[in-house]
């Protein structure tokens, strides 16, 4: 009885893994000078490559495509490109606008052509307990990470964890994750104490139930991450404050910095020079901003104080960070007032904050701000007010129903003896009035415009 060799098997190419082999000298001479003996390798089929390399397979065509293109644009580079596009549109340079838009659409530095591939990779986003938006990492279940009930692999994993990774897991995890972990540990401990002499079948049943619960947790986390990603993406799409948003009212912008911009309000404000300082990057509160963005916002404040001081006027800066979970785009409102009113403003706000919300609160009602970012935890809703360049007050909002969104404007309107319609409802003003207010303040801002230095540095 003869047995057919493996080489003659019809399904041989689908089963056997073909490893790369060096080209022999006699074949290398026939192929040409571009093939070097013993260095150029012959690769197998796609299936054999996948079987041999697994998930780490790198194909030649992918390598060539990655070498031909540039590095992908970072978030900061995209923001800077959007700011340049806005400046070019304000100047009327259409050629530069088209060039920069092509570069932004391509998403690759040094490439002006948009990508030809229609496939799109989406990075899932999520919010941590401090309100920061992070890429959602693929969390594997315990059964995938440690094997099916393998306590030895679990111990090895815990040994390999250093302090930094443990701190990272602690920070990126949410309160709900910790509660679910605590509940599962209680259930597990109760099952262990149930019988001292458990049989092999009981242990197998427990491991089977654990595997089912792990799969259930994995599906639940995937659904939650997709839902949260869609909610965050929706807040980005609907935002009218982001510098690259199509809904941004560009005619209201006074000047654009590196990470922030100054604009007049689109509603009928408390004054014709009622302004807002807005970060170009989407962020729900100023305490989540980077150091350089925070410092840049201080530059706008110094310039505005100088402008209004020349008019013998004072100014009030306030921020209303409400519903941080909804991921709104934060901005600081700037309202000029008469010098006499500015001197009394701190007394009005101090009294109003002490009387707001209920009598019994978990947090201190009135916080005298020295460094706001170190005094209020991230992820909290709060109200903050500053008087000129001096420190002001802050208040942690515990009940949104008892703390109105018009808290600051109502106080300022009362000091200025303005009618209720000025602060009750912010109705969008006519575009002609918006443009008129913006053009008038541009003339006042020109002597202290620190963004001119940025333009001069970019032209050099």
From Swiss-Prot:
Tell me the segments the record calls region Disordered: 38-78, 103-175, 193-227
Instruction: Please tell me one Gene Ontology term that the record gives under cellular component.
Output: post-mRNA release spliceosomal complex
Q: Name one Pfam family in it.
A: CwfJ_C_1
Spell out the Polar residues composition-biased ranges. Answer: 54-68
User: Where does the record place a coiled coil?
Assistant: 84-106, 210-231
Set out the biological process GO terms recorded for this chain's protein: mRNA splicing, via spliceosome
Q: Does the record carry Coiled coil as a key word? A: yes
InterPro entries associated with the record: Cwf19-like, Cwf19-like_C_dom-1, Cwf19-like_C_dom-2
**For bias kind Basic and acidic residues, which ranges apply?**
113-131, 139-172, 205-227
The alphabetized UniProt keywords are: Coiled coil
Q: Which family does it belong to?
A: Belongs to the CWF19 family.
Protein name according to UniProt: CWF19-like protein 2 homolog
Write down the species: Caenorhabditis elegans
């Amino acid at each position: 009885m003869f047995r057919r060799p493996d080489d003659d098997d019809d399904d041989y190419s689908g089963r056997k893994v073909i490893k790369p082999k060096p080209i022999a000298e006699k074949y290398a001479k026939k192929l040409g000078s571009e093939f070097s003996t013993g260095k150029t390798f012959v690769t197998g089929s796609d299936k054999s490559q996948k079987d041999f390399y697994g998930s780490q397979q790198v194909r030649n065509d992918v390598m060539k495509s990655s070498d031909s293109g540039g590095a992908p644009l970072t978030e900061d580079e995209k923001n800077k490109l959007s700011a340049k596009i806005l400046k070019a549109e304000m100047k009327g340079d259409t050629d530069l606008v088209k060039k920069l838009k092509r570069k932004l659409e391509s998403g690759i530095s040094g490439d002006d052509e948009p990508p030809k591939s229609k496939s799109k990779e989406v990075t899932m986003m999520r919010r941590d307990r401090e309100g920061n938006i992070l890429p959602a990492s693929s969390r594997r279940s315990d059964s995938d990470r440690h094997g099916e009930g393998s306590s030895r692999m679990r111990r090895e994993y815990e040994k390999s964890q250093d302090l930094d990774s443990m701190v990272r897991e602690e920070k990126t995890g949410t309160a709900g994750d910790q509660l679910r972990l605590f509940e599962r540990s209680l259930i597990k401990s109760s099952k262990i104490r149930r019988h001292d002499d458990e049989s092999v079948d009981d242990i197998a049943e427990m491991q089977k139930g654990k595997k089912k619960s792990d799969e259930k947790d994995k599906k639940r986390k995937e659904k939650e991450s997709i839902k949260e990603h869609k909610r965050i993406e929706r807040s980005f799409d609907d935002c009218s404050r982001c510098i690259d948003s199509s809904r941004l009212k560009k005619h209201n912008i006074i000047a654009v910095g590196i990470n922030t911009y100054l604009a007049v309000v689109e509603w009928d404000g408390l004054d014709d020079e009622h302004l807002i300082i807005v970060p170009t990057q989407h962020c729900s509160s100023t305490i989540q901003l980077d150091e350089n963005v925070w410092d840049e916002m201080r530059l706008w404040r110094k310039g505005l104080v100088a402008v209004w001081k020349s008019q013998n006027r004072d100014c009030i800066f306030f921020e209303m960070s409400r519903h941080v979970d909804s991921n709104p785009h934060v901005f600081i409102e700037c309202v000029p007032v008469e010098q006499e009113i500015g001197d009394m403003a701190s007394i009005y706000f101090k009294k109003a904050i002490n009387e707001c919300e209920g009598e019994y609160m978990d947090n201190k009602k009135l916080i005298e701000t020295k460094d706001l970012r170190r005094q209020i935890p991230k992820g909290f809703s709060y109200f903050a007010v500053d008087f000129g360049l001096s420190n002001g007050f802050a208040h942690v909002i515990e009940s949104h129903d008892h703390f109105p969104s018009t808290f600051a404007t109502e106080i300022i309107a009362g000091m200025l003896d303005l009618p209720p319609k000025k602060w009750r409802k912010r109705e969008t003003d006519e575009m002609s009035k918006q443009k008129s207010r913006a053009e008038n303040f541009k003339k006042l801002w020109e002597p202290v415009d620190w963004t001119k230095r940025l333009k001069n540095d970019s032209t050099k």
